């Protein structure tokens, strides 16, 4: 079941699952429902007033947590920086006391600067690392004086720390004040805007009525009521101005209270920090005045000097041993280099000899080939030369026979031609008869000799042809034998070359084996030398161990004294830590008390606001219960769209839902739209304004 604002005729309706009926304040159920709504509305208003206070308190707690985290991170950075500083001081240590300054690297200088920026938190922290700071002040790049006084520097850093805390608290105070002032200004502005909206709604409702309707509808007794309503509007203006003044006065009071409380908190925090610093200074003075502490410091300084002298002696011994080892290694290297140079020279000589051998063999092969081709002592070759000479003689004889035969044939032809000429010219050449007779006789003799000559020539020709054929066959055989001999000689020379190559390879392999044997021998020599060197190093190590034992016996006494001093120092540091813990616990208790006080003050302010609000609203609530209209006004819910406005001035009659004027402004732009709660359609002309 829920209560909804409706039009003036259907002023208050109750929507249930079964029916929709009007609110009747005479019944007990309706009255209880109305009172529940009023209580819910008041609680929502209280929550709205206290939300920003809670947000501010949460913001304050977050800032305090941030400050705690900042302090913890600073302490961690201090520890890291002091570890780095201890490393730097260990590397900065020099045995010469005459050195006053020492050039640092860029990284080391940046570390020292970071440490110098972070050294601003607690006196005990500085006291624990006082010797390292003294060394840095003596040997470092940020030298303060010839006789450094670190306490003054520590005091300066402590003052810087307190000023930093004050600055942080003042920043937090300003942030809180700004948030409070913005909250009260927003509340005042919202009240003024709501009152202006109410006035505008009243003016619009008055302008809607025309003068004629007022004359017809209102009786003679109603002008008095209208005058009374006008006086009520004036009274409302006076009440609003009073409320505004009350809000401003309350804001000023709250601001003054917050400022005073924050000032008290800052004063107490600074006082606690100063007390803490004073306690640590007193403890430092007391510890420094104790004679036992001074004696321990003197013993520590003497022990440090002894350790420095021992370290110097050891460093000189190490330098001598290293110098001796370096000289020995240099000599061994020089001997090995000389041996390697000799081996390289021998290798070059072997290469030159091999190249000369190859040249000599090539020249020998060429000379052998030439001699075999020019001067041969073989009988078969002589026979071939005789055959060739016989063939050449036979050819000459055959050619001579052919030439003789041709001459004979020429003579015969000439004789035949001469007979024919003589028969024709008998009469002309009678004088040459004697010559013809001679020729005829000769011709007859020749003709008688011709058949025998032909037979002899044929026989000689056949013999010559046979001899020629035999010579050709022998010549072919001789050529084949010559080719075979040449091939055999080539094979012989190839085999000789292969034999020479194999011999050279065999020699090279022997040389390689000899080199390997030499190399293995050198390696063995090197192994023997290394074993000797190792034995010498072992002897040196034994000597060094003996020296170390001698110095160790002397340093045992120093170490025992150091242990006693360290035990005493740990006891003193434990006492200091106990004091620091007690101071920290007292500081934590103070902080807890401050937080409790702050929570109580906040609760007091919230209760005072609630009490003032109850005082202001009690008479209004009582007046609201007097009339039904006032009860309806008090029982109105907040706008369901924005959940902020306390006044629903616009009503949709179709569904009976009401909303504030700000939420209904965008619906005036369209002629038709739907309800934002139940989505029932309506037009702009249907929207009604609700009046008190």
From Swiss-Prot:
Belongs to the BRE1 family. This is E3 ubiquitin-protein ligase brl1. Keywords: Chromatin regulator, Coiled coil, Metal-binding, Nucleus, Transferase, Ubl conjugation pathway, Zinc, Zinc-finger. GO terms for biological process: epigenetic regulation of gene expression; protein ubiquitination; transcription elongation-coupled chromatin remodeling. It is an enzyme of class 2 (transferase). Residues 302-370 form a coiled coil. It comes from Schizosaccharomyces pombe (strain 972 / ATCC 24843) (Fission yeast). Component of the histone H2B ubiquitin ligase complex (HULC) composed of at least brl1, brl2, rhp6 and shf1. It comes from the Eukaryota. Pathway: Protein modification; protein ubiquitination. The gene is brl1.
């Amino acid at each position: 079941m829920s209560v909804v604002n409706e039009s003036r005729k259907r002023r208050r309706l109750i929507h249930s699952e079964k029916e929709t009926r009007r609110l009747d304040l005479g019944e007990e159920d309706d009255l209880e429902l109305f009172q529940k709504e009023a209580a819910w509305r008041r609680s929502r208003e209280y929550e709205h007033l206290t939300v920003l206070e809670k947000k501010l308190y949460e913001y304050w707690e977050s800032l305090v947590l941030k400050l705690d985290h900042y302090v913890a991170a600073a302490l961690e950075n201090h520890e890291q920086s002091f570890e780095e500083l201890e490393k730097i001081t260990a590397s900065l240590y020099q045995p010469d006391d005459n050195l006053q300054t020492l050039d640092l690297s860029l990284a080391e200088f940046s570390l020292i600067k970071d440490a110098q920026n972070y050294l601003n938190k607690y006196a005990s922290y500085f006291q624990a690392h006082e010797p390292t700071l003294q060394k840095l002040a003596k040997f470092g790049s940020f030298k303060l004086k010839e006789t450094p006084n670190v306490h003054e520097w520590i005091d300066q850093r402590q003052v810087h720390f307190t000023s930093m805390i004050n600055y942080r608290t003042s920043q937090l105070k300003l942030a809180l004040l700004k948030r409070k002032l913005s909250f009260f200004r927003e509340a005042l502005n919202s009240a003024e805007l709501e009152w202006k909206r109410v006035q505008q709604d009243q003016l619009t409702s008055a302008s809607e009525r025309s003068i004629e309707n007022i004359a017809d509808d209102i009786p003679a007794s109603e002008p008095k009521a209208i005058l009374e309503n006008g006086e009520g509007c004036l009274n409302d203006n006076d009440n609003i101005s009073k409320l505004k003044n009350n809000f401003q006065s309350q804001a000023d009071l709250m601001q003054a209270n917050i400022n005073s409380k924050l000032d008290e908190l800052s004063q107490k925090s600074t006082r606690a920090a100063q007390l803490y610093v004073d306690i640590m200074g007193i403890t430092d003075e007391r510890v420094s005045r104790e004679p036992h502490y001074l004696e321990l410091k003197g013993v520590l300084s003497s022990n440090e000097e002894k350790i420095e002298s021992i370290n110097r002696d050891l460093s000189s011994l190490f330098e001598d041993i290293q110098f001796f080892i370096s000289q020995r290694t240099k000599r061994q290297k020089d001997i090995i280099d000389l041996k390697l140079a000799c081996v390289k020279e021998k290798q070059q000589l072997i290469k030159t000899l091999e190249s000369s051998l190859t040249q000599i063999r090539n020249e020998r092969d060429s000379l052998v080939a030439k001699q075999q081709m020019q001067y041969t002592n073989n009988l078969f070759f002589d026979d071939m030369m005789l055959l060739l000479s016989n063939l050449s003689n036979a050819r000459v004889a055959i050619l001579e026979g052919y030439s003789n035969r041709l001459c004979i044939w020429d003579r015969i032809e000439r004789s035949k031609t001469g007979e024919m000429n003589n028969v024709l010219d008998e009469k002309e050449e009678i004088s040459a008869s004697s010559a013809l007779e001679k020729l005829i006789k000769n011709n007859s003799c020749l003709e008688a000799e011709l058949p025998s000559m032909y037979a002899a020539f044929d026989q000689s020709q056949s013999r010559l042809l046979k001899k020629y054929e035999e010579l050709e066959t022998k010549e072919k055989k001789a050529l084949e034998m010559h080719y075979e001999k040449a091939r055999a000689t080539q094979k012989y020379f190839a085999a000789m070359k292969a034999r020479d190559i194999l011999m050279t390879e065999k020699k090279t392999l022997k040389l390689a084996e000899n080199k390997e044997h030499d190399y293995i021998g050198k390696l063995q020599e090197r192994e023997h030398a290394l074993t000797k060197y190792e034995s010498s190093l072992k002897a040196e190590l034994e000597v060094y161990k003996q020296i170390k034992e001698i110095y160790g016996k002397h340093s045992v006494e120093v170490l025992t004294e150091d242990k006693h001093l360290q035990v005493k120092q740990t006891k003193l540091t434990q006492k200091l830590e106990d004091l620091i813990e007690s101071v920290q616990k007292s500081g934590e208790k103070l902080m807890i008390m401050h937080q409790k006080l702050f929570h109580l003050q906040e609760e007091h302010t919230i209760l005072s606001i609630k009490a003032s609000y109850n005082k202001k609203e009690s008479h209004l609530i009582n007046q609201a219960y007097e009339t039904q209209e006032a009860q309806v006004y008090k029982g109105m819910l907040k706008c369901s769209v924005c959940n902020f406005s306390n006044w629903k001035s616009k009503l949709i009659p179709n569904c009976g839902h009401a909303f504030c004027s700000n939420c209904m402004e965008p619906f005036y732009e369209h002629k038709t739209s739907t309800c934002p709660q139940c989505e029932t359609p309506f037009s702009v002309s249907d929207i009604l304004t609700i009046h008190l």
